């Protein structure tokens, strides 16, 4: 069974759907980056790469994992 792990600066959340993990990440990024121009750039990168950065520091990412049934 596959699932998606959303890592946010030290905490981890698990989702069965990539879409749900990406949407939750987007909601969090919208709160973190209030400037519209910066927010749009970060969110576009998020949907393309499944990673988010603040400067050079990675603040969020999604990985695809497999679990034995």
What does each model-found stretch correspond to?
Residues 1, 16-23, 64-69:
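A short, sequence-level motif marking secondary-structure junctions
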Residues 7-8, 19, 42:
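Intrinsic structural disorder/low-complexity segments
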Residues 14-36:
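Short, flexible N-terminal segments of the mature chain
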Residues 30-69:
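Short, mixed-charge low-complexity intrinsically disordered segments
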């Amino acid at each position: 069974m596959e699932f998606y792990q959303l890592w946010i600066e030290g905490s981890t959340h698990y989702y069965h759907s990539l879409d749900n993990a990406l949407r939750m990440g987007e909601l969090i990024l919208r709160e973190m980056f209030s400037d519209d121009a910066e927010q749009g750039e970060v969110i576009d990168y998020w949907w393309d790469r499944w990673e988010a950065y603040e400067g050079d520091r990675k603040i969020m990412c999604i990985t695809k994992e497999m679990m034995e049934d």
